Amino acid sequence: MSATKLDGNLYRDEIFEDLAQRVAALKEKGITPGLATVLVGDDPGSHSYVKMKHRDCEKLGINSIRKDLPADVSQEELERVIEELNNDDACTGYIVQLPLPKHLDENRVLELIDPAKDADGLHPINLGKLVLNEEAPLPCTPNGCIHLLRRFGVELDGAKVVIIGRGVTVGRPIGLMLTRRSENSTVTLCHTGTKDLAAETREADVIIAAAGKAHMLTADMVKEGAAVLDVGVSRVDGKLAGDVAEDVWEKAGYVSPNPGGVGPLTRAFLVSNIVERAEKLAAQ
């Protein structure tokens, strides 16, 4: 068998069509949402990704503000930029592209973001609200994962889901989201301390690979017909590579390509968070 392709580009276009209508309605009220990005350093992948986010904004009629900083930027200067965006009424919400260079205090930077403007849903307050099941901006990549699975009819209620990777952007928050009553999945979070990863993944109905280790998930680790999301990003010979090996496509029932799977939906739900906040401001 050959797995069904979980095509994020197709679903992204559906979401963008809805967002474009909502942005147009906001503009009729004199409100134009604005998304800002803060990018530190010259990583080609990060620059490409941020460029796509601004292209999305242009397509949808959303203002975009880009703050590109050198790799050796000081903590003080970065914090000044964060404060500037917190106070900028033209900025509905913004993201700090992660990871940051090691000399910068990433947690401190995330804490300084105005939680209401946290377009990535990664501020400690917003993650805390996720734990408490309170309304807050949701982390974009986990939200994209769940919507992609639902869009293609993958059952989550009662499903055994194995997550590989415990990073703050995907692994930790998606476990919280999948155990909400709206998803009702049974979640196992695997990481470098997991003694027998293959034993866990072979029992999974859904596998979310977010380890950042190229091609680490192979066909012998996957149950026949399982759904597999490839969220990991690493580099092999200078090229971007996902966590899922090619042979998984012949055994799984559903596989998201990388790129072209979850990534487009990460961007879609980033913009969605901005539009939702603009709508709330308009209703005040």
Swiss-Prot record:
Pathway: One-carbon metabolism; tetrahydrofolate interconversion. InterPro entries: Aminoacid_DH-like_N_sf, NAD(P)-bd_dom_sf, THF_DH/CycHdrlase, THF_DH/CycHdrlase_cat_dom, THF_DH/CycHdrlase_NAD-bd_dom. It catalyses: (6R)-5,10-methylene-5,6,7,8-tetrahydrofolate + NADP(+) = (6R)-5,10-methenyltetrahydrofolate + NADPH; (6R)-5,10-methenyltetrahydrofolate + H2O = (6R)-10-formyltetrahydrofolate + H(+). GO terms for cellular component: cytosol. One of its GO terms (molecular function) is methylenetetrahydrofolate dehydrogenase (NADP+) activity. GO terms for biological process: L-histidine biosynthetic process; methionine biosynthetic process; purine nucleotide biosynthetic process; tetrahydrofolate interconversion. The keyword NADP applies. CDD domains: NAD_bind_m-THF_DH_Cyclohyd (cd01080). Keywords: Amino-acid biosynthesis, Histidine biosynthesis, Hydrolase, Methionine biosynthesis, Multifunctional enzyme, NADP, One-carbon metabolism, Oxidoreductase, Purine biosynthesis. Its EC number is 1.5.1.5, 3.5.4.9. NADP(+) binds at residues 165-167, 192, 233. Gene3D superfamilies: Leucine Dehydrogenase, chain A, domain 1, NAD(P)-binding Rossmann-like Domain. It holds the Pfam family THF_DHG_CYH. Belongs to the tetrahydrofolate dehydrogenase/cyclohydrolase family. Homodimer. Catalyzes the oxidation of 5,10-methylenetetrahydrofolate to 5,10-methenyltetrahydrofolate and then the hydrolysis of 5,10-methenyltetrahydrofolate to 10-formyltetrahydrofolate. NCBIfam families: PRK14193.1. This is Bifunctional protein FolD. It comes from Corynebacterium aurimucosum (strain ATCC 700975 / DSM 44827 / CIP 107346 / CN-1) (Corynebacterium nigricans).
